Regions:
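Short glycine-rich, low-complexity/disordered patches
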Residues: 24-41, 90-107, 191-205, 214-220
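Right-hand nucleic-acid polymerase module
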Residues: 100, 113-220
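Helical scaffold of the NTase/Pol beta-like nucleotidyltransferase catalytic core
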Residues: 1-40
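Active-site nucleotide-donor binding segment shared across nucleotidyl transfer reactions
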Residues: 28-59, 63-71
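Alpha-helix boundary/N-cap detector
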Residues: 5, 9-16, 72, 76, ...
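Conserved catalytic core of two-metal-ion nucleotidyltransferases
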Residues: 29-32, 78-131
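A broadly used, surface-exposed interaction patch
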Residues: 61-88
Length: 220
């Protein structure tokens, strides 16, 4: 079952390690004429990091491409980022990352003096257009690399959920209701062996449910 990670010391140390690797990635990309900026997203950014029993913890980062030679050459961008990230990982005695459809994921990382908890980094490559819309770089793999597709896929607008979360936090005690409900939702899906609802979807559901409950009670 999922539980919140309460060890603040570990979280601070792990996120510092992850951010250090991401900063090195930024520097490496700059040498390849790619200007980028990373930021922590997901449960790590919301201080809602969960762990399923003793399974590894994931820290999600977005790597925003600010400028490069050709923003539309998605394959070149993905490959340059992947190669640069692998170089950074090797320089830190870590294994190469895995390349999935929408992210680059490190192998499991652990501290030698605290090996009970493993963690990994998921890096999504994103960019923002002049209208403020966010796009995620996706890599659809064919049965061989010749048929692979690389493209920018527009991400759902999360502004309205941020506004709802802000409204909930303005009422004392109600954010704890969101935290509990979020954990309940994740565990309900886990009991059903439903792995089609990622953490962000569970978070949106929790925010919507609590926000609607507060509206019905005329708290908002």
């Amino acid at each position: 079952m999922y539980h919140y990670v309460e060890d603040k010391g570990f979280l601070k140390r792990a996120q510092k390690t992850c951010s250090g690797l991401m900063a090195e990635l930024e520097d490496e990309l700059r040498e390849n004429d790619i200007n980028s900026q990373f930021f922590l997203v997901g449960s790590g950014a919301r201080n809602m990091v969960t762990q399923n029993e003793q399974e590894p913890i994931d820290f999600d980062y977005n790597l925003s491409i600010i400028s490069c030679e050709d923003i539309n050459d998605c394959k070149a961008i993905k490959e340059l980022v992947r190669e640069a990230f692998n170089k950074v990982l090797r320089n830190n005695s870590l294994n190469d990352c895995d390349d999935s459809t929408s992210s680059l994921t490190t192998k499991k990382i652990y501290f030698t003096d605290y090996s009970l908890v493993e963690f990994s980094i998921d890096v999504c490559i994103v960019t923002r257009d002049k209208n403020g819309n966010w796009f995620r770089l996706k890599h659809d793999k064919g049965y061989n690399s010749y048929y692979d597709k690389y493209y920018w896929n527009e991400s759902p607008n999360s502004d309205k959920y941020s506004e709802k979360a802000k409204a909930i936090k303005s009422a004392p005690g109600w954010w704890e209701v969101v935290r509990k409900h979020y954990l309940d939702i994740k565990n309900d899906y886990l009991k059903k062996n439903d792995y089609n609802h990622p953490s962000f979807v569970c978070y949106i559901q929790a925010v919507n449910d609590v926000y609607n409950q507060m509206r019905q009670k005329r708290i908002l």
